[in-house]
A protein has these predicted regions:
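Central cavity-lining transmembrane alpha-helices of secondary-active solute carriers
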Residues: 59-76, 127-131, 270-282
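Helix-loop-helix hairpin linking two adjacent transmembrane segments in secondary transporters
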Residues: 144, 151-197
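C-terminal transmembrane helical hairpin of 12-TM major facilitator-type secondary transporters
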Residues: 291-337
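Symmetry-related core transmembrane helices of the 12-TM Major Facilitator Superfamily/SLC fold
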Residues: 179-197, 390-409
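Transmembrane alpha-helices of Major Facilitator/SLC transporters
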Residues: 264-288, 298-305, 369
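Cytoplasmic helix-loop-helix junction between adjacent transmembrane helices
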Residues: 115-156
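A late C-terminal transmembrane helix in Major Facilitator Superfamily
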Residues: 327, 332, 338-388, 394-398
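Conserved MFS/SLC helix-loop-helix module at the cytosolic interface between two early adjacent transmembrane helices
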Residues: 69-107
Length: 417
């Protein structure tokens, strides 16, 4: 996640706080995002030096979704009941434990799997609780809610990008490639935990007479026809594009980047994330509140990205691979902002006051895209005649099919419906 579409100013009551109080929470979010994405450029390393098959390694990329989705869906309502601190304090702990298990598990699929799940839990807590806490602290510190939202988004984005870049560089050129990158994250998480304990005041008092938790978890707007036919077709492409850009393409190019395959994977990751973040301001301008232009533009860019990825898989040249990763990153950013803006409008106009829950559902579906590398690796393992070029061509067709569904959904189910 690199952005938020919630531009509404929340009502945040309570005493004022230091203007810099939000930084402690932002560092915890940064450390969790770092821990979530540090593993990605190292996939090439585990393929080359570990005793794991391609399917197993790509499945590890997806496994942290097992931690993200439950914590994302549940921790938000829990933090509304019990406060932000009790739910956010464990995030850097989970991040550190996850990195520790990854550092110890270079040759153990079990330790790597558990470590990825712990990293996912930390990221889910940070996305659901950390973002709200940063916004509330920003408002109490004298900044606007929009500033708080930007700070939360930047904390996540910086963690994702810098974490991948530093981890890739350390694994490529520093000693102890299976350990050192994770030690950096453990240190960051420890510092973040201390700062949370001493410098981050609570902004949400525990609810005195809470209702049933199951009622808080209900999200009526998730059944809205526009959400089903316009938002869901684009959602898995968000991180499906990312996974293609910095998991599949670097793996295909590993033989052509023998001098620095891990650094090349990190470069693809950073390029994709940077392009995705940079394109989002354009995505806001393209989007129209009463239309479907943002989603249509995103799926069009994604189809182009799939075409370039097919060319990269066929040509196996570094320059085409980097271009494909960058365009796929643009598709990721466009799909993210278009989906979030649609979610905001659906929740606002439905009158059900479930924006946070609907946003969590959207993010949960976006993370399913990380399953794509494992699925494609499984296909190539069982059907050797099917190449990645063929599958990326199928991706073009799939993106255009999703575009057709979204256009149909827009015509049949207007935003205000």
């Amino acid at each position: 996640m690199t952005t938020t579409a919630d531009n509404a100013t929340p009502t945040v009551t309570g005493p004022t706080v230091r203007r810099t109080a939000w930084i402690a929470v932002a560092l915890a979010v940064f450390a969790s995002a770092w821990g979530g994405n540090e593993f990605t450029p190292l996939l090439v390393m585990y393929r080359e030096t570990g005793n794991f098959g391609a399917v197993a390694v790509d499945a590890l990329l997806f496994l942290y979704v097992v931690g993200i989705v439950p914590s994302l869906l549940i921790s938000g309502p829990l933090s509304d009941r019990y406060g932000r601190r009790p739910l956010m304090l464990p995030a850097p702990v989970f991040a550190a434990v996850g990195s520790l298990l990854l550092a110890l598990g270079a040759n153990s699929i079990v330790l790597l799997s558990i470590g990825r799940v712990f990293s996912g839990i930390a990221l889910g807590l940070s996305m659901a609780v950390g973002g709200s806490w940063i916004t509330e602290l920003s408002v109490r510190g004298g900044a606007g809610a929009a500033s708080g939202a930007r700070r939360a988004a930047m904390s996540l984005t910086a963690g994702f990008g810098i974490g991948a870049g530093v981890a890739g560089a350390l694994a490529q050129w520093a000693p102890w490639p299976h350990v050192l990158a994770y030690v950096v994250n453990i240190s960051l998480a420890a510092i973040a935990l201390v700062l949370l304990l001493v410098r981050a005041p609570e902004t949400r008092s525990p609810s005195g007479t809470p209702g049933r938790l199951v009622d808080d978890l209900k999200i009526p707007s998730a059944a809205h026809r526009r959400f089903l036919f316009v938002v869901l077709p684009v959602a898995p492409w968000v991180f499906g594009a990312c996974a293609s850009a910095y998991a599949i393409i670097p793996a295909l190019m590993s033989a052509r980047t023998a001098g620095a395959p891990i650094a090349f994977a990190a470069l693809c990751c950073v390029l994709g994330l940077a392009a995705g973040f940079g394109i989002q301001s354009l995505g806001r301008r393209i989007d129209n509140p009463d239309g479907v232009r943002g989603v249509a533009a995103a799926l069009t860019v994604l189809a182009i990205g799939m075409a370039l990825a097919a060319l990269a898989a066929h040509m196996l040249t570094i320059w085409m691979s980097l271009i494909a990763a960058t365009v796929l990153g643009c598709g990721y950013g466009m799909a993210m902002i278009a989906g979030l803006l649609e979610v905001q409008r659906i929740a606002a106009r439905s009158g059900r006051n479930d924006l946070a829950g609907l946003t969590a559902v959207f993010y949960s579906v976006t993370y399913l895209g990380f399953a794509i590398p494992a699925v494609l690796a499984l296909i190539t393992e069982f059907w050797h005649a099917v190449t990645y070029t063929h599958m990326f061509i199928f991706g073009i067709v799939a993106a255009l099919l999703c575009l057709a569904i979204a256009l149909y959904g827009h015509r049949r189910h207007a935003v205000a419906a």
